[in-house]
UniProtKB/Swiss-Prot annotation:
Widely expressed at high levels during embryogenesis, especially in the central nervous system, especially to the actively proliferating neuroblasts in the periventricular neocortical neuroepithelium, in the telencephalic cortical plate and in the hippocampus. Also expressed in a stage-specific manner in the mouse germinal epithelium. While strongly expressed during brain development,m its expression turns down in adult brain. Disruption phenotype: Mutant mice mostly die in utero or soon after birth likely because of developmental defects in the cardiac outflow tract and/or neural tube closure. Few mice that reach the adult life, equally distributed between males and females, show a dwarf phenotype likely due to defects in cell proliferation. Deletion gene also results in disruption of the testis cytoarchitecture and block of spermatogenesis. This is POZ (BTB) and AT hook-containing zinc finger 1. Keywords: Metal-binding, Nucleus, Repeat, Zinc, Zinc-finger. Residues 250-260 have a biased composition (Polar residues). The keyword Manganese does not apply. Residues 250-279, 332-351, 564-587 are annotated as: Disordered. Residues 41-130 form the BTB domain. PANTHER family: ZINC FINGER PROTEIN, ZINC FINGER PROTEIN 271-LIKE. CDD domains: BTB_POZ_ZBTB19_PATZ1. Homodimer. Interacts with RNF4. Interacts (via C-terminus) with TP53; this interaction inhibits TP53 ability to activate transcription.
Amino acid sequence: MERVNDASCGPSGCYTYQVSRHSTEMLHNLNQQRKNGGRFCDVLLRVGDESFPAHRAVLAACSEYFESVFSAQLGDGGAADGGPADVGGAAAAPGGGAGGSRELEMHTISSKVFGDILDFAYTSRIVVRLESFPELMTAAKFLLMRSVIEICQEVIKQSNVQILVPPARADIMLFRPPGTSDLGFPLDMTNGAAMAANSNGIAGSMQPEEEAARATGAAIAGQASLPVLPGVDRLPMVAGPLSPQLLTSPFPNVASSAPPLTSKRGRGRPRKANLLDSMFGSPGGLREAGILPCGLCGKVFTDANRLRQHEAQHGVTSLQLGYIDLPPPRLGENGLPISEDPDGPRKRSRTRKQVACEICGKIFRDVYHLNRHKLSHSGEKPYSCPVCGLRFKRKDRMSYHVRSHDGSVGKPYICQSCGKGFSRPDHLNGHIKQVHTSERPHKCQTCNASFATRDRLRSHLACHEDKVPCQVCGKYLRAAYMADHLKKHSEGPSNFCSICNRGFSSASYLKVHVKTHHGVPLPQVSRHQEPILNGGAAFHCARTYGNKEGQKCSHQDLIESSDSYGDLSDASDLKTPEKQSANGSFSCDVAVPKNKMESDGEKKYPCPECGSFFRSKSYLNKHIQKVHVRALGGPLGDLGPALGSPFSPQQNMSLLESFGFQIVQSAFASSLVDPEVDQQPMGPEGK
């Protein structure tokens, strides 16, 4: 409370005091009356399933729309006598007293947005939610609440986030055009015109087409373009009922320029206005202002490229929806778009035609990517590696694979368990989860198979889809494997394992067999080459061992000590002849196949410990991890030889016989030979 000087006081003297908080306290008390059961409230606003009691004086003071509606009710006695009256979007219920109807039903505003606007009328505070921001702004323009309009303008200037149009619900009808079929009933967007029309006796004489056109014009007029909102001048106060044109369209210029919706157009007539035209007043109104909405779901973008990418997900373009892709407008110093010369030529950005896959319906931007995608359905792999023959569906992946042969593709991420290298850390993590861990959280619902990663499960699910039966044996296979399967019936096995003499129809199956059952990759046996019948000894003796006199090759020790070869008729076939070289060392004298010698020439990665050559770095890393690191113990120092093999040599042989001869030779040969070598200094010479 403060004292102010008042010149109107006479010479007798008077004092004038002003309470600055009086208006705030008055609004607070009125708000408490409204919330406490609607005490002393003289109007009930029904929005959807909710009711909002309020004071006419507060609504009329905040909203020029309510001021016009209540003024029309005061000037007409029809609603006061209890007769039914429909105010377009606001329906007056019977039972009103002197001063108009006590109930007003709002059809065009959701209860959530109207509650925020009503709270602002009593508290001068409003919560702006981005998901309902377009609806709030349109409702503020419709209700002619200038303060809320200025707040929305400020939000647009300061906010750069995407504004989402609210979803299609029964209680959100402000962003739906008249006659929308998904709601089940036509929407009346005039919101105040019909009551005044009924009061003047105009609505009864209008034809249905005129009523639809008037309702459409009012709906378009109440929803002008969103981003740039012009200042709203106060409506002139009238003592009597307002004219129907004034109540129907608060923005007469916009309403007169907007064409009415027509159900069917003939030749030469303008096209039917679509959803965005009815929402934003004129075709392309938002796009000219710098905001680009999607024509299907209503999502708003500020970048034309993002809008095109989003529309491609729907399978349509802006051109197909009836909108021309305009370049983003230039903004002036005040943040408003600069109007360009209307007489200048309008440029259309070239839009690519969207193409879709006929099988799965996926959308692609051109035919090249569509044809590349079709290979995933046919299983065709037209590109093959010139080095190893591995086939690929895409040329870029084949080129990347070819670089792995000459070492240009680095694999810095090494698995600590098996030594395999990877070019990316996520590939290493997927390898560890799938191979070296026992957790399988992702399960197949069809066959109950479990997998470590979701990608493995997704690849496995393809095995249960689109299987076709073989015409010969009736086995169900995917189309990608049917060609290889038919070779079994027509040609028979053409690729033979050089160790176990087992035949396979394709080289890829042979590679899997050799890696699974024999431990390391072996040279391919051509279609016209005789299979090796000596148990693969030629392959195992390809490398020269510098053993001293009296010693044998490691594979001979393993063969002679193994009971799995006792049933052979001639054990001499498994023994390899030896001859002494000039320096006194012994080496295996077994003929090496020609293709083996050729394959050795391709091995460019030598082992720094034993001098063995390998075809790739991954095989070299596996060899070092299995043979040298485990045998020597790595960082364990002198305890390495003791911990390299947890069992005795005899226990190792009996334990590992079931895993195959090659695993014994590659993984545990050094653990059986090195202890003898290490004991040489402990002989009579050392003692």
